[in-house]
Amino acid sequence: MFAKTAAANLTKKGGLSLLSTTARRTKVTLPDLKWDFGALEPYISGQINELHYTKHHQTYVNGFNTAVDQFQELSDLLAKEPSPANARKMIAIQQNIKFHGGGFTNHCLFWENLAPESQGGGEPPTGALAKAIDEQFGSLDELIKLTNTKLAGVQGSGWAFIVKNLSNGGKLDVVQTYNQDTVTGPLVPLVAIDAWEHAYYLQYQNKKADYFKAIWNVVNWKEASRRFDAGKI
């Protein structure tokens, strides 16, 4: 689950609410990490985690908060002056909300999806999730192989998500997205893997396949199992 600082700002009636309907809203913030920056070494370096969290993720936090503020201001303006020009401005701001909001939520999922080996990182899933993986993919290794294929297929920047699809009886699937697009609606993200260069380049340089292979040593399958059982993040 999201850390308290993020959850308090986003959770409404048990779900994820990115836009407040009140005149005054609480801005989103970086989530608390449950481990130190260096705790995922040697698979992900402390330097990468520190920059990823304090610089890149913070940029999405700032960008999302700014975009939501601008959207609310434009909403008020459009109510007073319902012109095509103001409508176009709102459309443009929605694109920023989608990008920075996706970056914010994707990274919140990403940090929760990781854990050092001392906290169970890399340990295979158990229970209902393990059974579903075996039934659909034959083994965890086959699911990881499929996910890595999706990650390798990202041209430029993007993500791969292992999801539970609530629209087809809760079947598992692997979804590839570009830039900071996220999964929504009936797709419950169980595992989110960042394929942007900032997630690996300082350590793995152009050998991103090595990063895709290494990260599974610190994937938090306990968190994935919790989301699978709950049917929500």
Swiss-Prot record:
Targeting presequence: 1-26
Catalyzed reactions: 2 superoxide + 2 H(+) = H2O2 + O2
Principal location: mitochondrion
Molecular function terms from GO: manganese ion binding; superoxide dismutase activity
GO cellular component: mitochondrial matrix; mitochondrion
One BP annotation, GO: reactive oxygen species metabolic process
Keyword annotations from UniProtKB, A to Z: Antioxidant, Manganese, Metal-binding, Mitochondrion, Oxidoreductase, Phosphoprotein, Transit peptide
Pfam families: Sod_Fe_C (PF02777), Sod_Fe_N (PF00081)
Enzyme Commission number(s) from the entry: 1.15.1.1
Amino acids binding Mn(2+): 52, 107, 194, 198
Cofactor info, note text: Binds 1 Mn(2+) ion per subunit.
Phosphothreonine sites (modified residues): 147, 149
Known cofactor(s): Mn(2+)
Subcellular location: Mitochondrion matrix
Its biological purpose: Destroys superoxide anion radicals which are normally produced within the cells and which are toxic to biological systems.
Family classification: Belongs to the iron/manganese superoxide dismutase family.
Subunit: Homotetramer.
Miscellaneous remark of the record: Present with 10900 molecules/cell in log phase SD medium.
Name of the protein in question: Superoxide dismutase [Mn], mitochondrial
Organism: Saccharomyces cerevisiae (strain ATCC 204508 / S288c) (Baker's yeast)
Source organism phylogeny: Eukaryota, Fungi, Dikarya, Ascomycota, Saccharomycotina
